[in-house]
């Protein structure tokens, strides 16, 4: 990390594709499929934002982007001209823009491509790395962002309900395989039904977790093949609104038919751990404190924490992951509810998702989304969290 050599104000330098670079999209509110450059120049007590992008996108950017100036690389061509490579030309234009503005110091976050640092330094500009700058700015959600998350979670709950009812209301073949519309009900069929429903609601959906049986003892097992009666099925859905770009994230566990006694016990422990975690969440509490409350609750219920050792019996049952994470434009954002998790801030959106996993049985997980408040948290979920979805 560079050390400033003078006291002059520093400019922010960022570059990326807004459709996939969430921090740039969050800052400018404008999505495009090619790399853009965002430069924020010190001005008075604030800054002036310049967006550099392809000339064919300038009209839309002037209409929709939250910036003060829109330009293309040709507007900041250096004396030797621009490269024929688009990203190199962007880096050259960024350095020239900073040079013309008299900037001697700039900073970027953890996502700034090295080529931009190199061209800026060639122009005599010191570039500092501030890896957490945008991370910290994005943690506290505005009322508008919370409204987007609330709506995304509402729709996500609809998808969860669809999947859990489809499983719970299926018929069972003599060998225990679930049947629906004359064919075996598989994880793939449930996943497809969820995808189609969410598409109609205006959401894009990454590969949902529809994980039944022993395979679900891996907490991130997506689930494949036929679903069976009497086995817990973890349903974890995390879609993104196509318009707002904000995500929902919710998990429930469903069992078709008779629920095994051990699954009932695991579910009660998971539910109690979630309650224990949510009781700790408030402004100033740490993500680590929340996670330790989850672990303490699991241990009090008779379960372990940590991945199984190589010689562990298949009946070993434990929570194997953190308690939760931040959520927003990205489905996984800081902070973590885990060891070394930081102090929580007002307005942060978090998932709370304890789970238990057993190799010979599968897994049980419950996940809600909460908003951190001064004295506690607001749970955005309204869906029941039981095992019977008939």
Q: Where do the language-model regions lie?
A:
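Active-site neighborhoods and metal-handling regions in enzymes and metal-associated proteins
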Residues: 2-390
């Amino acid at each position: 990390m560079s050390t400033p050599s003078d006291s002059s104000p520093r400019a922010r330098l960022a570059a990326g594709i807004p459709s996939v670079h969430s921090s740039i999209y969050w800052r400018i509110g404008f999505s495009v499929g090619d790399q853009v450059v965002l430069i924020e120049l010190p001005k008075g007590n604030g800054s002036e934002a310049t967006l550099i992008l392809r000339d064919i996108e300038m009209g839309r950017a002037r209409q929709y982007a939250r910036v003060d100036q829109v330009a293309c690389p040709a507007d900041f061509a250096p004396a030797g001209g621009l490269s024929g490579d688009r990203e190199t030309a962007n880096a050259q234009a960024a350095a020239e823009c900073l040079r013309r503005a008299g900037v001697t110091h700039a900073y970027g976050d953890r996502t700034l491509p090295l080529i931009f640092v190199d061209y800026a330094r060639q122009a005599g500009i010191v570039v500092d790395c501030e890896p957490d700058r945008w991370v910290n700015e994005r943690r506290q959600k505005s009322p508008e962002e919370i409204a987007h998350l609330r709506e995304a979670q509402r729709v996500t709950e609809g998808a969860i309900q669809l999947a859990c009812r489809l499983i719970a209301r299926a018929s069972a073949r003599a060998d225990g395989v679930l049947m629906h519309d004359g064919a075996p009900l598989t994880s793939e069929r449930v996943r497809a039904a969820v995808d189609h429903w969410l598409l109609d609601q205006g959401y894009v959906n990454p590969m949902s977790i529809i994980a039944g049986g022993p395979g679900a003892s891996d907490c991130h097992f997506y689930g494949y093949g036929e679903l069976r009666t009497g086995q817990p099925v973890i349903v974890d859905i995390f879609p993104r609104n196509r318009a707002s770009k904000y995500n929902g994230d919710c998990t429930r566990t469903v069992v078709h038919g008779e629920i095994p006694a051990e699954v009932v016990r695991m579910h009660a422990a998971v539910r109690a751990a979630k309650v224990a975690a949510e009781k700790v969440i408030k402004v100033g509490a740490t993500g680590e404190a929340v996670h330790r409350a989850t672990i303490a609750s699991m241990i009090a219920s008779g379960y372990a924490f940590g991945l199984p050792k190589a010689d562990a019996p298949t009946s070993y049952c434990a929570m194997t992951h953190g308690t939760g994470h931040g959520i927003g434009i990205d489905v996984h954002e800081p902070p973590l509810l885990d060891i070394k998790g930081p102090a929580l801030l007002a307005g942060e959106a978090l998932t709370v998702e304890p789970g238990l996993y057993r190799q010979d049985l599968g897994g049980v997980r419950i996940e809600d989304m909460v908003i951190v408040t001064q004295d506690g948290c607001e749970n955005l979920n309204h869906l029941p969290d039981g095992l019977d979805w008939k």
